[in-house]
From Swiss-Prot:
Key words of the record: Secreted
Family affiliation: Belongs to the snaclec family.
One GO CC annotation: extracellular region
Keyword Membrane annotated: no
Tissue occurrence: Expressed by the venom gland.
Domain of life: Eukaryota
This protein's record includes keyword Membrane: no
Bridged cysteine pairs (disulfide): none
Name under which the protein is recorded: Protocetin subunit alpha
């Protein structure tokens, strides 16, 4: 999954 906001990508689980 690619988060729209890479500025806060840490909020998402990097896959």
């Amino acid at each position: 999954d690619t988060p729209s906001d890479w500025s806060x990508f840490t909020r998402y689980t990097y896959k």
